[in-house]
Structures are given as structure tokens and as C-alpha cells.
Amino acid sequence: MARTTAINRYRNIGICAHVDAGKTTTTERILFYTGLSHKMGEVHDGAATTDWMVQEQERGITITSAAVTTFWKGSRGQYDNYRVNVIDTPGHVDFTIEVERSLRVLDGAVVVFCGTSGVEPQSETVWRQANKYGVPRVVYVNKMDRAGANFLRVVGQIKNRLGHTPVPVQLAIGAEDNFEGQVDLIKMKAIYWNDDDKGTTYREEEIPADMLDLANEWRSNMVEAAAEANEELMNKYLEEGDLTVEEIKAGLRARTLASEIVPAVCGSSFKNKGVPLVLDAVIDFLPAPTEIPAIKGIHPDLIEKPKDELVEADYDERHADDAEPFSALAFKIATDPFVGTLTFVRVYSGFLSSGDSVINSVKGKKERVGRMVQMHANQREEIKEVRAGDIAALIGMKDVTTGDTLCDLDKQIILERMDFPEPVISVAVEPKTKQDQEKMGIALGKLAQEDPSFRVKTDEETGQTIISGMGELHLDILVDRMKREFNVEANIGKPQVSYREKISKSNVEIEGKFVRQSGGRGQFGHCWIRFSEPDVDANGNITEGLVFTNEVVGGVVPKEYIPAIQKGIEEQMKNGVVAGYPLIGLKATVFDGSYHDVDSNEMAFKVAASMATKQLAQKGGGVVLEPIMKVEVVTPEDYMGDVMGDLNRRRGLIQGMDDSVSGKVIRAEVPLGEMFGYATDVRSMSQGRASYSMEFSKYAEAPSNIVEALVKKQG
């Protein structure tokens, strides 16, 4: 079957925003307008169509949220049919992982801001993540009908607070109750929306006389920004003082794809004024899969090689081309009560038909692809194949987790994995009844498969099941989902902080010796190891894991025992050296030792290395680290003193303060151990008017009274 939409007419986009910018309404409107332009005849005969709104009401948790395929011909039918895959992203910081994983598979993003609140603390987090993945963006300033809305003020905030260059391609006509439409700066026309068809169509008129000067000023800014795309456009602009509509769009597009500028549009999704033009901006300014850099990957044989040791020759590339070997990234796993496990994948190269086999190159397991579906604005469609650039859900994959690569059996590759943060908070969960016991195991397994920032383990000493995640809200929602989706009732223990340890000295030389020789075959392992504290970057982040080097010369320790020494250090790192918490990072160099022809073996050297590592508590200056959270509280000014006093009592360090529409924004770094129950406390302090967000910042040394309590607890 041939491709129905040319790949240069694909757009894989995400709608990103913080909690109250009106993202859900905007996404719903996109589905509404694209659903209208999607001709039913294009759906393959016999496709199972179900109204997605009914499904959402049944579920509560949507499967449409992962990825929806829509079609768009332009607000005036000015384009060939474009295929727009919309990936939804949550706005809450406990779910930063969700945003990260969707940005990883997007080619472009629409970032929604509220016309009144503008740039809020959480919008900065989303923006930073989009920078990390180099995602080209279009800005949509929504809620222009709200009191205090001001498009150009928000544009100024994006420039000053986010450090990016926004280029308005529209201006708002009126604001608040009098918001009527937009000035299209590219065509220099005023746009007014028709209420009788819910803003599907609009009429173009001349720009109101009182706005002409402002429109001319912003248009010349925009044309100048477009002209800076290349020399040819710049020369024409300098000679003629203007560019054609096509040239303006081409110039802005080139600079948007290079992440030099972000085109900005405005509107009111709720009042049906402007969303079709947001979709036009997606087509005009955001990239097709062929316009983003080829995705890189490594061969499965190199999976154990540390990332910083990989050289250019180790990498392979996959281009957005049907003729290349198949490769895809699983970016979300969802459990659907009707069809079982849905694995959402982004196809980067090649094509795949249902019934084909692929290999999960991360786990080395072969999987047969049964059914495949795509979500549309108003139906779920069973499809027979996927091609480069597509986003679809595979049904019935057995052993795939988020971030795994699926690829061609003969041309294997592991695409760059997503970085998943380590959980910072843990709680014990216990099933309420015997019947819940087994169900809980299955439920937790499924939830962990869906969400890589959620971990499940059994405490060896107490036998309790411990779940870990990114914050209290994260774990609350997972426990709630266990109850709602899997019918499992569980009791939750008190939250526990994930402490870590490290050493504070460098170049500490320690001897590890394990000798058992009492007749017959004995044990003999002897090594000298030089330990140093891990490196720390400019932002205070510690290099995690073991950096191990071998400087043994002359064969005093045979080569085959070196991996055992490394393993011994790693195993002891998991158990810690001060209070039983894992060592976050460590540098170790084995440089000397001795062996016995008969009695030496791998086990003996492993034990010797482990014994040497244990001595770091005294000799290496072992310290306990606690997770420090970046906290932002938005509070009315009247409660500012109380909020700041409370943060100080929680050992918080105030980093700074800003003004926002809703009051003062207090930025602080606070140890996680002091933040339990903060949601309730901050509400009661401010009579329910303050709100806060919190994300992991770094690990830092814990004060001695806390360390003493932890050591005592370990007994």
C-alpha cells in the first residue's frame, strides 16, 4: 500500500503549556476543526469508528491523550491535505517525565500561554525541556477575552524571562470583553470570526484605522526578522523595503526551524476565535519529519559502553525515509480495558506491516506486531502499516517499556534513549485484603511499565512493597489509578526520602584483602584501590555511578580478575558505607595487588574489593546526601511573610522573588524531607489562595543531626 500523505506534509507536534493556560480547550478545538475538515471517505472501509468523547467519559483517563492523528487543509482550504499528529503533554511538574517523553518524539511544539498570567513558573520548565531537545516552537497566547489580557505584554515576558526572540505574526484587535479578532501582519488584513459556525470561518477586512500605525511598526519588525534568514532575502529587503507573503513565510520558517525565533499568534480558544490560524502557523512554520536532523543510535553490542566513551564512529543514523531499515521508539505504554496493552511508537525510518516481526534491540527480544491503530479526532482506526514519520499504537507487545527501540531484525540499532530522572520519594503500600495481594502485584507491574519514573521494589528486611516516584502527587495519582482501573485497595505508609551517600575525600588508597587458606582449596584476593569523590558540574549535579579504571601493570593482578574487582565495588556501592543508602557516584582505580596461583578466583577478588570499599566510611569521609527540591510558591502579597518564614523553618534557602499577576512568586531550594504535607500547610497559611510547584534540583550534604538519626535507624 502506497503512502497516502507525502512525508513533507506531515507535522508531528505537541501542545505544551502549564496548568491553566487553556491547553485542553485548545486541543479540543483543534480536534473539532480538523475533524470537520477530515473527509470521512478517507477512512479505510470497515475501520472501527468510536466517538472519542464517549470513550473519554467511560475511561476518565484518556487514551486519546497520547497521540491523535488529524488532517488539515488550511483555514481557507489553501493547502493540500496535511497530516498533523498531535501529542498531548501534561502541565503539572510531577509529570515532567511525561512532557520529556513527548518532546523527545515531537518535531515541533505549540506552546500555549495565558493572555493574563503570561509566563508562569511552570512554563519555564516546559520551555527549558523544549530547549534541551531543540524543538522548534510557535507561541499561542490564549484567553485574550479574559480581564487583564495583553498579547504584547506576554510577548515581552517571553523575550525577557525565557530569553527567546518571539516574532508576532498577528496583533489582537481589542482585548478582554472587546476582543474581536486578529490583525494578520503577513497579509495586512483584519480577521473577524463567524460565531454561527463556531469560528470555523472568518472574514477579512481592512485594518481598523486606529491600529494601522501599530500594525505597520510590528510588520516591519516581522519582515526584518524574516529577511535575516539568508543573504538573498536580506538584499531584497534592503533594496525594496519589503518582501512577498511567500518570502516572509519562508524566512520565518527557516529561522523557526533553526530555533532562532518563535512566531507568536493570539486568540481565544474558548470563544472560538483563532485556533484555525494556530493550525495554519503549524503548517507554515513547524518542520516536517524530513526537516529535522536524522536520529542517531548505536549498535546493540555497544549498550554497555558508557555514554561519554562513545565516539563518532559508534553512532549510526536513521533518516525519515521509507526505504531505510525500520526503526521506531516506544514513547508511551497505555493499558486499555478493551484491547490490552497499547504501545505508542514514533516511526523514524522504514515501514512496518501488521504481522511483521521486529526486534526490541534494548532487550534483545523478538516481537511480532499484531494489530496497529491510529487515534483520529472522532474515531479509532485499525491500520495495516506504518511508515517513517507516523505515530501509532501497536497492540499486544509483550515486553516493551517506555524508551525501548523497535527495529529491523537484520539492521539493528538502539535509538538515543530518554533520560529518566531517579525517583526522590518512596512510600510503603500494603494490600487491604488477601484478595488484593495478587492483584496489586499485577497492577503495580503494569503501572511501572507505563511510567519509567515510577519504581516498585520489595524491602528485603521488612518484606514490604515500596513504590517510588517524582513527588507526593505522582504517587497519589498512581495509588488512585490502582483503585480505579485495577480495583485494588491499598494502605499507604508515610513517605520516605531517597537519601544517597558519597565520599568527600580524593586519592584515598585502601587495601582490600580476603584470604581463607586452611588446607585444601582456599580463597585469595588482594587489591589496592585508589578512591576519589565523584565529579560535580557547574550546576551542582554529581556524576552518578562508578567511574572505574585499571592501572595494574606487570600482571600483579591477572586481567581476568579486574571485572570482579569492579563488581565488588559496585555491589558495595548499592549498600552504602555510612547509613546503608546507595553511593551516588564514585571514582575508583585499581593499581596494585597480588594473587595466588591456586587459591585466587573471581569471588575472592570481588569480596576483597567490597571490603576495601566498606572502609570508605572512615577513610573516605563518607557523607549522607539529601534530595533538594526547587520550590516556587505563588502567593498573594498579604501572606508573603508567613510563606517565607515557613520556608525558612523548613531549612529552605530563598533564591529570589518575582512579581506575577496572581501575586508574588517566591523561589527557594528546600530539602524534600521537610516538604511532606506542604500542599495542606501552604493552603491553610494563605486561606487557599497560594499555590506551589516543586521539582527535583540536586543532592546536597545532609546536616549532622539528620545523619545521626538515619544511622541510628539503620541500627
From Swiss-Prot:
Q: Which UniProt keywords apply?
A: Cytoplasm, Elongation factor, GTP-binding, Nucleotide-binding, Protein biosynthesis
Matching entries from InterPro entries are given as: EFG_II (IPR041095), EFG_III (IPR009022), EFG_III/V (IPR035647), EFG_IV (IPR047872), EFG_V (IPR035649), EFG_V-like (IPR000640), EFTu-like_2 (IPR004161), G_TR_CS (IPR031157)
Q: Which PROSITE patterns match?
A: G_TR_1, G_TR_2
Q: Where does GTP bind?
A: 17-24, 88-92, 142-145
SMART domains to which the protein is assigned, alphabetical: EFG_C, EFG_IV
Q: Where are the coiled-coil regions?
A: none
Q: Which Gene3D superfamilies match?
A: 3.30.230.10, 3.30.70.240, Elongation Factor G (Translational Gtpase), domain 3, P-loop containing nucleotide triphosphate hydrolases, Translation factors
Concerning CDD domains, the annotation shows: EF-G, EFG_III, EFG_mtEFG1_IV, EFG_mtEFG_C, EFG_mtEFG_II
Q: Record keywords: Cytoplasm included? A: yes
Gene symbol? fusA
UniProt function note:
Catalyzes the GTP-dependent ribosomal translocation step during translation elongation. During this step, the ribosome changes from the pre-translocational (PRE) to the post-translocational (POST) state as the newly formed A-site-bound peptidyl-tRNA and P-site-bound deacylated tRNA move to the P and E sites, respectively. Catalyzes the coordinated movement of the two tRNA molecules, the mRNA and conformational changes in the ribosome.
What Gene Ontology terms for biological process does this UniProt record contain? ribosome disassembly
| Name of the protein | Elongation factor G
Q: Which PANTHER family match?
A: RIBOSOME-RELEASING FACTOR 2, MITOCHONDRIAL, TRANSLATION ELONGATION FACTOR G-RELATED
Q: Indicate where this protein is primarily found.
A: cytoplasm
GO molecular function terms here? Answer: GTP binding; GTPase activity; guanosine tetraphosphate binding; translation elongation factor activity
Location comes to: Cytoplasm
Membership in a protein family: Belongs to the TRAFAC class translation factor GTPase superfamily. Classic translation factor GTPase family. EF-G/EF-2 subfamily.
The tr-type G domain covers which part of the protein? 8-290
Report the GO terms under cellular component: cytoplasm
Q: What organism, scientifically named, is this protein from? A: Pseudomonas fluorescens (strain ATCC BAA-477 / NRRL B-23932 / Pf-5)
